[in-house]
Amino acid sequence: MAFLLSFLILAFLITIIFFLSSSSTKKVQENTTYGPPSYPLIGSILSFNKNRHRLLQWYTELLRLSPSQTILVPLLGNRRTIITTNPLNVEYILKTNFFNFPKGKPFTDLLGDLLGGGIFNVDGHSWSSQRKLASHEFSTRSLRSFAFEVLKDEVENRLVPVLSTAADVGTTVDLQDVLKRFAFDVVCKVSLGWDPDCLDLTRPVNPLVEAFDTAAEISARRATEPIYAVWKTKRVLNVGSERKLREAIRTVHVLVSEIVRAKKKSLEIGTGAEAKQDLLSRFLAAGHNGEAVRDMVISFIMAGRDTTSAAMTWLFWLLTENDDVERKILEEVDPLVSLGLGFEDLKEMAYTKACLCEAMRLYPPVSWDSKHAANDDVLPDGTRVKRGDKVTYFPYGMGRMETLWGTDSEEFNPNRWFDSEPGSTRPVLKPISPYKFPVFQAGPRVCVGKEMAFMQMKYVVGSVLSRFEIVPVNKDRPVFVPLLTAHMAGGLKVKIKRRSHILNNV
């Protein structure tokens, strides 16, 4: 089997080399002024492999050297990749010429096995129809109210008790794991009307959680393969990681389909008064069925389960390194929490929102996102794009560009989000272009759950910090790992201590 796999890969490479060698050298070398060293036939694969363990830092270093903040990374056997941190380019890709930069088949191939025809993995009519439905539902007061009640219940009756027990017993907890479990509970309740009860740490890991983790990780690693033929061949032969991925996806699809069938049955025999407010019930009521509705809810679970937990994990760690910032958050949230933190109170938490934005600027939940050019084009900075090129905007690198954020771009400074230093008067967040800070995408594909995500994060940060001190066990700087959603390598091991001030009310 191993010999056959090697032979097939070698045959594919020979084909690619022949194709490349027959192409015009002039065409290959357009736009190669900035980027890693590139050689005939093999492109930049030598530099890529050398820096594969530090791709984020490597791309950022290369982009800093480019006057246009755009680089070209040609790789053997793959499409040309254009990477940019230029906001003008980002706006052009995500808005101005949106229809020329769809996700494209190469992207949908990566995630198609898992996400199927869900909103985050399709283009054209399928995307627009799902987008219209999702935008309507996320804009309704009833869904926001339902989501807030789910959030409040999960925080007060599960998250806080888990942290209280850790504080009383003195055990070490992985805060990243706790927040991921919490987020999975919330997103499943809101999306499916189903409670996986992941924060019960005495129970085995839910099979759906385990399968989601495995499927997401292997799918993400497909994108980092320098030669796509490797994972595609493994998929055809059903061996190695691709076999493991197929099994995990089967588990996800089977379990979610069972939940969908049960929900549909309960709605059919129930009365109007018993109708649920979760997204699945709403999608079924709109006439969606079968694999279509399954793929839709899987996409929303995938989008919501790790993004907020990743952002909160990094913020909680950053606050342990910045006592003055933590103190300002407490000054903001303590008066609100003392009266019972409500939905309207979240609008008053401007400084907390600035801290969350600053954490996501430095450690974006999604490090990069790629589109594929439908036709030849020219970006605003003059970069020529060929049909089929992969065009990537790079939030991780954008957050570290001095040209965008100043000489302190690598420092954690929430005050940069205000027009002036927050003082005794209510601080006002200044408008920041979503094309400079595209962590929630921008343009027609801007995240429909953006405001709901901020609602969740602000409520959790306020509820946790007002009650507990978080003390990292390890003083080493955490390692940022980019997958489908970035996470902290090894988790965030902490001790939990109750706060000594008057709000210690649990």
From Swiss-Prot:
Hydroxylase involved in the oxidation of the plant hormone jasmonoyl-L-isoleucine (JA-Ile), a bioactive phytohormone of the jasmonate-mediated signaling pathway. Converts JA-Ile to 12-hydroxy-JA-Ile. Exerts negative feedback control on JA-Ile levels and plays a key role in attenuation of jasmonate responses. Negatively regulates the expression of wound-induced genes TIFY11A/JAZ5, TIFY5A/JAZ8 and TIFY5A/JAZ10. Catalyzes the hydroxylation of jasmonoyl-L-valine (JA-Val), jasmonoyl-L-leucine (JA-Leu) and jasmonoyl-L-phenylalanine (JA-Phe) in vitro. Its cofactor is heme. Plants over-expressing CAP94B3 are deficient in jasmonate perception. Keywords: Endoplasmic reticulum, Heme, Iron, Jasmonic acid signaling pathway, Membrane, Metal-binding, Monooxygenase, Oxidoreductase, Transmembrane, Transmembrane helix. This is Cytochrome P450 94B3. InterPro entries: Cyt_P450 (IPR001128), Cyt_P450_E_grp-I (IPR002401), Cyt_P450_sf (IPR036396). Its EC number is 1.14.14.48. It comes from Arabidopsis thaliana (Mouse-ear cress). Pfam families: p450. Heme binds at C447. One of its GO terms (cellular component) is endoplasmic reticulum membrane. Belongs to the cytochrome P450 family. It is a single-pass membrane protein. The keyword Transmembrane helix applies. Its main location: membrane. It is found in: Membrane; Endoplasmic reticulum membrane. It catalyses: a jasmonyl-L-amino acid + reduced [NADPH--hemoprotein reductase] + O2 = a 12-hydroxyjasmonyl-L-alpha-amino acid + oxidized [NADPH--hemoprotein reductase] + H2O + H(+); L-isoleucine-(+)-7-isojasmonate + NADPH + O2 + H(+) = L-isoleucine-(+)-12-hydroxy-7-isojasmonate + NADP(+) + H2O; a jasmonyl-L-isoleucinate + NADPH + O2 + H(+) = L-isoleucine-12-hydroxyjasmonate + NADP(+) + H2O. GO terms for molecular function: heme binding; iron ion binding; jasmonoyl-isoleucine-12-hydroxylase activity; oxidoreductase activity, acting on paired donors, with incorporation or reduction of molecular oxygen. The chain crosses the membrane at residues 2-22. GO terms for biological process: anther development; defense response to insect; fruit development; jasmonic acid metabolic process; pollen development; response to wounding; stigma development. CDD domains: CYP86A (cd11064). The keyword Transmembrane applies. It is an enzyme of class 1 (oxidoreductase). Disruption phenotype: No visible phenotype under normal growth conditions, but mutant plants accumulate high amounts of JA-Ile and have strongly reduced levels of 12-hydroxy-JA-Ile in response to wounding. Induction: Induced by wounding.
